[in-house]
C-alpha cells in the first residue's frame, strides 16, 4: 500500500516538474490527487480493521501473542519450517498469560505441542521432576501448560506463535 502511495507521489512530482502544458486544466493532477486520497483512506480503514481483529483475537487470552494450530501433527524440525513459512515462530511463552493462551490451544485440541524455553526470561512452567534431559532435548507443553523434556522426533500438534508489534 505504501508503495502505491509513493508511486502516486512520484507521478504527482513528475507532473509538477514538467509543467501544465499537457494538462492545462489540471484534470490529470486532480485525478492523481483524488486517487491518492482514496488510497490513503483505504489504507487507514484496513489498518483499523487489522487492529480490531488483532485486539479481538488477543482479548480473551490477555496476551498480545497469538497461538494458532493448523491441526497437523509433526516433529520439531517440521514445526520450525511450518511456522517460519507461516510468518510465525515456535511458541516461546515468556509470561504466565502467554503460557495460559498457549495452553488454551492445547486444551481445545486435547494435544501436546513443542515450545522453546531458551529465551523465556524469568518465567518457567516446568512440571514436577522436569526438566529431565534423559527424556530428550526438546520441550513440550501438556494440555495444562506444564513443560516437559521430550524427544525432538516426537510428533506433536503444530502450534505457531504470532506476535504483532504495532
UniProtKB/Swiss-Prot annotation:
InterPro entries attached to this UniProt entry: C-type_lectin-like, C-type_lectin-like/link_sf, C-type_lectin_CS, CTDL_fold
Metal-binding recorded as keyword: no
C-type lectin domain segment(s): 46-161
UniProt keyword terms in alphabetical order: Calcium, Disulfide bond, Glycoprotein, Lectin, Phospholipase A2 inhibitor, Secreted, Signal
GO CC, alphabetical: extracellular region
Tissues with expression: Expressed by the liver.
A Pfam family of this chain: Lectin_C
Keyword Calcium: yes
GO molecular function annotation: carbohydrate binding; phospholipase A2 inhibitor activity
Domain of life: Eukaryota
UniProt main location, coarse: secreted
Signal sequence residues: 1-19
Record localization: Secreted
Glycosylated residues (UniProt): 122
Disulfide linkage: 83-160, 138-152
Family note: Belongs to the alpha-type phospholipase A2 inhibitor family.
Function comment: This phospholipase A2 inhibitor binds directly phospholipase A2 in the presence or absence of calcium.
Quaternary organization: Homotrimer; non-covalently linked.
Protein name: Phospholipase A2 inhibitor A4/A5
Organism of provenance: Crotalus durissus terrificus (South American rattlesnake)
Lineage: Eukaryota, Metazoa, Chordata, Craniata, Vertebrata
Amino acid at each position: 500500500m505504501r508503495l502505491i502511495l509513493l508511486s502516486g507521489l512520484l507521478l504527482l512530482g513528475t507532473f509538477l516538474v514538467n509543467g501544465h502544458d499537457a494538462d492545462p486544466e489540471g484534470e490529470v493532477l486532480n485525478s492523481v490527487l483524488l486517487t491518492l486520497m482514496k488510497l490513503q483512506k483505504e489504507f487507514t480503514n484496513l489498518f483499523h480493521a487489522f487492529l480490531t481483529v488483532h485486539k479481538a483475537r488477543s482479548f480473551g487470552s490477555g496476551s498480545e501473542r497469538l497461538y494458532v494450530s493448523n491441526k497437523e501433527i509433526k516433529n520439531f524440525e517440521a514445526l520450525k519450517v511450518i511456522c517460519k513459512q507461516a510468518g510465525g515462530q515456535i511458541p516461546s511463552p515468556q509470561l504466565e498469560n502467554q503460557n495460559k493462551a498457549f495452553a488454551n490451544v492445547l486444551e481445545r485440541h486435547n494435544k501436546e505441542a513443542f515450545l522453546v524455553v531458551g529465551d523465556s526470561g524469568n518465567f518457567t512452567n516446568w512440571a514436577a521432576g522436569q526438566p529431565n534431559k534423559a527424556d530428550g532435548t526438546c520441550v513440550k507443553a501438556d494440555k495444562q501448560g506444564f513443560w516437559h523434556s521430550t524427544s525432538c522426533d516426537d510428533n506433536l500438534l503444530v502450534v505457531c506463535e504470532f506476535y504483532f508489534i504495532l
